[in-house]
Structures are given as structure tokens and as C-alpha cells.
């Protein structure tokens, strides 16, 4: 399987996975025109759409793709049913599409039904985790997002992180100010800032465990750099604190 992307809207990535027969899977089409253009250019045959959650910047290309390719099958959580999902994955552990197995990983927090698709070593994770950060959390779902990130962190270190937004530079620019002594964050930020390549993805889980504070919640050195009075002795409290200060930025 090969994976390519097309950039849509402002900073969204639509990932396209295809096999030797040029049958392809489209992940989170937030817009359709760029996707169709890419498909035609490479002579791909769209067979499947995978949706991670129901936000418009991930689904608003579905309608036109379905009109253009009426035989396409759509997979997603229940919350995406309104946009044409016929193959619901909420109660499934795996799906097999294009002779390839995908593990279904519930990752609630950004939305209640948010789901990631894991086809080792590829993780299509939507807005759950970003390079250097994580998705905004829906009201009342801090614990769910915390647990979702813990689930992702248990995957193999060689897991390739295919998230849906190009936020790496802005995430690290923020966190290098919060954790100025963290050389992993600073060095990685400087490297991507110098790079002529705009796309910083995919990342790897191994890299994220070094540069992403949301995957270092048990790191006492990071906690000690945060000079506040809140009780940060527990990793959940540290996560909530980091997410709240990031939301204010």
C-alpha cells in the first residue's frame, strides 16, 4: 500500500491509500475538488471512504465524492451517519477493506465518537493526536481524551502518525516557550523550521514520545518546569492543565 495526501481548506490533509491495482481509500475528505483532481491525475479507483469523526472539515467532501463515485463505500462512527455512512464501525474491532485489515481504535475526546484506524504501521488518527499536540477537547471529555492518548501511546514505537492537520510548527512554537529547557522540542522545532518541506507528516510514535508533551504526562522534569500552584502530581491533572493553556493560546 502507498499513501499520498492532498491539502485542502487551510491546513487539512486528506490521506489517500492505494494498492497495486490503484484501488484507493480516502480518509476524512474535508473537500472534494482537490481529492478528485488527485485521483484523476494518478488514475486511481476510489473504493472506500474512512471517516474519523463528524466535523465539517473532515466530511464536507463526502457528498460530492458519493455523487461522482456512487459505488464508493463509507465507513465511520455513528456520529457520521448523517453524511452517508452505511458501514458503522462503533462495535467492531477490525474491518477488512481492499484485502487489508484495519484495527478500529475508539479515541473519544475531540468528539464523543472519534475513531482512529490502525493498519500497522499506519495510524489514521484524525484530530485525536497531532505532531507536537492533540485535538481540542469537547466539553466534559477531558478524561476520555486523556485515555485516548494513553491508548495511542501503547502502540508500537514505529507507528506512523497520519493526523489530519498541519499543526506541528505552531504546536512546538507554543510548547518551546512553556518548556524552554526541553532540547527535544527545541531541536525538532528548529529542524522543521529550516526544512524546505512544508509537510511535517507522518510523524512516528517514537518521535512524538520525545517532542509531544501530551505523551509525556509522567515526565517529572516537564512538570517541574511549570511553575503554578495547581496539583500536577497526577498525569491527568497535568494533561488538563496543558490542554487548557494551549486552548488559550
UniProtKB/Swiss-Prot annotation:
GO MF annotation: an example: hydroxyacylglutathione hydrolase activity
Cofactor: Zn(2+)
Pfam families in alphabetical order: HAGH_C, Lactamase_B
Class in the EC hierarchy, top level: hydrolase
Binding residues for Zn(2+) 2: 57-58, 127, 165
Residues bound to Zn(2+) 1: 53, 55, 110, 127
Keywords: Hydrolase, Metal-binding, Zinc
Pathway of action: Secondary metabolite metabolism; methylglyoxal degradation; (R)-lactate from methylglyoxal: step 2/2
EC number, as in UniProt: 3.1.2.6
Alphabetical GO biological process terms: methylglyoxal catabolic process to D-lactate via S-lactoyl-glutathione
Cofactor-binding details, from the entry: Binds 2 Zn(2+) ions per subunit.
Catalytic activity: an S-(2-hydroxyacyl)glutathione + H2O = a 2-hydroxy carboxylate + glutathione + H(+)
InterPro entries on file: Clx_II_MBL, Glyoxalase_II_hydrolase, HAGH_C, Hydroxyacylglutathione_Hdrlase, Metallo-B-lactamas, RibonucZ/Hydroxyglut_hydro
Family designation: Belongs to the metallo-beta-lactamase superfamily. Glyoxalase II family.
HAMAP family to which the protein is assigned, alphabetical: Glyoxalase_2
Subunit note: Monomer.
Chain's role: Thiolesterase that catalyzes the hydrolysis of S-D-lactoyl-glutathione to form glutathione and D-lactic acid.
Name of the protein in question: Hydroxyacylglutathione hydrolase
Protein encoded by which gene: gloB
Amino acid at each position: 500500500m502507498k499513501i499520498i495526501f492532498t491539502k485542502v481548506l487551510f491546513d487539512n490533509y486528506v490521506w489517500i491509500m492505494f494498492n497495486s491495482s490503484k484501488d484507493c481509500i480516502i480518509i476524512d475528505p474535508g473537500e472534494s475538488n482537490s481529492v478528485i483532481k488527485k485521483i484523476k491525475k494518478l488514475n486511481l479507483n476510489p473504493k472506500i471512504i474512512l471517516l474519523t469523526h463528524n466535523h465539517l472539515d473532515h466530511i464536507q467532501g463526502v457528498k460530492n465524492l458519493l455523487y461522482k463515485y456512487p459505488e464508493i463505500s463509507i465507513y465511520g462512527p455513528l456520529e457520521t451517519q448523517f453524511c452517508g455512512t452505511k458501514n458503522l464501525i462503533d462495535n467492531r474491532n477490525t474491518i477488512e477493506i481492499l484485502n487489508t485489515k484495519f484495527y478500529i481504535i475508539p479515541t473519544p475526546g475531540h468528539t464523543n465518537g472519534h475513531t482512529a484506524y490502525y493498519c500497522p504501521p499506519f495510524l489514521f488518527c484524525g484530530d485525536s493526536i497531532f505532531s507536537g499536540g492533540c485535538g481540542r477537547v469537547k466539553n466534559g471529555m477531558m478524561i476520555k481524551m486523556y485515555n485516548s492518548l494513553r491508548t495511542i501511546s501503547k502502540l508500537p514505537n514505529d507507528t506512523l502518525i497520519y493526523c489530519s492537520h498541519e499543526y506541528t510548527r505552531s504546536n512546538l512554537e507554543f510548547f518551546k516557550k512553556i518548556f524552554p529547557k526541553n532540547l527535544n522540542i527545541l531541536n525538532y522545532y528548529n529542524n522543521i523550521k529550516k526544512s524546505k518541506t512544508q509537510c511535517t507528516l507522518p510523524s512516528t510514535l517514537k518521535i512524538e514520545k520525545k517532542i509531544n508533551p501530551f505523551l509525556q504526562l509522567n515526565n517529572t522534569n516537564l512538570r517541574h518546569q511549570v511553575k503554578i500552584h495547581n496539583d500536577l502530581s497526577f498525569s491527568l491533572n497535568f494533561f488538563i492543565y496543558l490542554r487548557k493553556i494551549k486552548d488559550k493560546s
